[in-house]
Swiss-Prot record:
Family matches, as InterPro entries: UreF, UreF_sf
Protein name per Swiss-Prot or TrEMBL: Urease accessory protein UreF
Subcellular location: Cytoplasm
One Pfam family here: UreF
Lineage: Bacteria, Pseudomonadati, Pseudomonadota, Alphaproteobacteria, Hyphomicrobiales
Subunit structure comment from the entry: UreD, UreF and UreG form a complex that acts as a GTP-hydrolysis-dependent molecular chaperone, activating the urease apoprotein by helping to assemble the nickel containing metallocenter of UreC. The UreE protein probably delivers the nickel.
Role of this protein: Required for maturation of urease via the functional incorporation of the urease nickel metallocenter.
Keyword rRNA-binding tagged: no
């Protein structure tokens, strides 16, 4: 029996779906990736809560977090308009700057789509079988009619929370430090989500070269906790 999950116009339903899809317990495997943070800690570039907050805010404002938000927004629009998603999926995959970043986004995207099928939607038939994580999240949110601004804010917060969880395991800070950073990042996340909601593909671009290099260097790190 096929169960059709309708597009939601109810803000509470939209919120519940976002909280489920982007929860740390949603089986996308996010807990196993550090996005290069593990190498940054290893090399002494991130040593405390202040440095971690700075690292995260620039990833969100001008780094991979920003690019992923732009890709997420464009995927949402394609889903809402019934447009083809293969081109944006190919671009998102190509933008992965290293082997482990590519693995991180593709495996998370595939796992996200597999788990999100618990909320049936025709969008799954329009997506390629292998799909980068921001494209998967944006397309599924758009397919279910979840508002774009809320989807982007939740997506960016989930990105930061995953790295904050990694920072605890890496002994950069503790739970009190993490909660303080979460509170401090709220304006950054809100502002970046608002910019991304108005963005186009011409707004893609990042300037966090050290973070990208750390992701590359992690590939040869001998002792590690994370896959990226």
């Amino acid at each position: 029996m096929t169960i059709i999950t309708p597009i939601t116009n109810d803000p509470t339903t939209a919120l519940l779906r976002l909280m489920a899809w982007l929860s740390p317990v949603f089986p996308a495997g996010s807990f196993s990736y550090s996005h290069g943070l593990e190498r940054a800690v290893h090399d002494g570039l991130v040593v405390d809560a202040a440095g971690l907050q700075d690292w995260l805010q620039w990833l969100v404002r001008r780094g991979s977090g920003w690019n992923d938000a732009v890709l997420c927004a464009e995927s949402w629009r394609c889903a809402m308009k019934g447009e083809d998603l293969h081109e944006i999926a190919e671009l998102a995959e190509a933008l992965a700057g290293s082997r482990e970043r590519h693995m991180e986004t593709m495996l998370q995207g595939g796992a996200f789509l597999a788990a999100a099928r618990s909320w049936p939607c025709e969008i799954f038939d329009r997506l390629p079988p292998d799909c980068a994580y921001p494209v998967a999240v944006g397309a599924v949110a758009g397919g279910h009619g979840v508002p774009l601004a809320q989807a982007l804010a939740a997506f960016l917060q989930a990105f930061c929370i995953n790295l904050l969880q990694a920072s605890i395991r890496l002994s950069v800070t503790g739970q009190s430090g993490v909660t303080a950073i979460m509170a401090a990042l709220e304006p950054v996340l809100g502002e970046t989500a608002a910019r991304a909601a108005l963005s186009s593909m011409e707004d893609l671009g990042s300037a966090t070269f050290i973070a990208d290099i750390m992701a590359m260097k992690h590939e040869t790190q001998h002792s590690r906790l994370f896959r990226s």
